[in-house]
Design a protein with these regions (language model features):
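TRNA-recognition modules of translation machinery and tRNA-sensing kinases, especially anticodon-binding
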Residues: 1-308
């Protein structure tokens, strides 16, 4: 990873932000080459999903009032576990500290993380001490205020673009003449106050997002022809489910066997593979990993990560 980051920096693709003032971890600049690549990827994404006749593009604010994020669950649930070193005061994501000792450390609870840190004698990456406070949840949103002084309202920089699209649902519903299904897509900035950003661009505090929200009638879901995607892909189903482990399977077979829980999800997985191939990704380097129940986002009933 360090060699890749060094190469991207030398070639003017991605560089650390504010470097002459010491820099800030989790913030990057796109140089002349990187900005052009980013623009081409975003344009390709919009072209791909915009080709669906019942999907439109929207643009909503990055500042989100607190009530919206209370309703979505982000104020109460959008957390990572943090461990603080008593010796130097350094704060680190607890699951990152034990990543080499557990296959899925982000699924562990606070007490399990504390036990593993103690059992494996995990030392502080900054000062090499072994004196940790108990792991505790830290909300990942940047808080701000709207207005001045006593009349201000609590708000947050959006952690994702989805909430803006949900707020637009009544307008979108009217736009589509009150008929489901339909979708809205949006690109733009997202913000997450990561505890300990690392891995180059993998964990950033300000990052670019491209999201699509697709609204269906759960009692009358759209049925798409998945036979158009006969090729098998690499999938890693829920490790706690009936078929754990890596398998090669088509999207249609994955739906019929119950691995993918909904036809719309299967269709979007297939369309995602099409997009990746369109921008030049080798399909043999792609896999789809299903989230375990303990890993699932607080609002999800099924979730898949596309990993390259």
């Amino acid at each position: 990873m360090s060699r890749l980051v060094s190469l991207l920096r030398r070639r003017g693709v991605v560089l650390p932000s504010f470097e002459i003032y010491g820099g800030v971890s989790g913030l990057v600049d796109y140089g002349p080459v990187g900005a052009r690549i980013k623009r081409r990827v975003i344009d390709a994404w919009i072209e791909h999903w915009g080709s669906i006749t019942n999907v439109v593009e929207v643009d909503s604010p990055t500042i989100t009032p607190e009530p919206v994020l209370i309703a979505s669950g982000h104020v109460g649930e959008f957390n990572d576990k943090m461990s603080e070193c008593r010796s130097c005061g350094g704060a680190f994501r607890s699951d990152h500290l034990v990543a080499e000792f557990h296959e899925a450390p982000d699924t562990l609870g606070s007490s399990e993380l504390d036990e593993l840190i103690e059992r494996k004698v995990v030392r502080c990456p900054s000062c090499d001490s072994f004196d940790w406070k108990k792991a505790m949840p830290m909300n990942l949103m940047f808080q701000t205020s709207i207005g001045a002084m006593g009349g201000s309202r609590v708000a947050f920089l959006r952690p994702e673009t989805a909430q803006g699209m949900f707020m637009l649902f009544p307008a979108l519903y009217r736009h589509f003449r009150q008929k489901l299904p339909f979708g809205a897509m949006q690109t733009g900035k997202g913000y997450r106050n990561e505890i300990s950003p690392r891995q180059g661009m993998i964990r950033l505090r300000e990052f670019n997002m491209a999201e699509l929200e697709y609204f269906i009638d759960p009692d009358d879901p759209p049925i798409d022809d998945l036979s158009k995607w006969p090729d098998r892909v690499c999938m890693i189903p829920d490790p706690d489910g009936p078929r754990p482990g890596e398998i090669e399977i088509s999207f249609e077979e994955a739906l019929e066997s119950g691995i993918v829980k909904h036809p719309t999800v299967a269709w979007f997985l297939a369309m995602t593979m099409d997009f990746l191939e369109f921008v030049g990704i080798d399909r043999t380097k792609v896999r789809f990993r299903q989230h375990a129940g303990s890993e699932m986002a607080h609002y999800a009933s099924d979730c898949w990560d596309c990993e390259i």
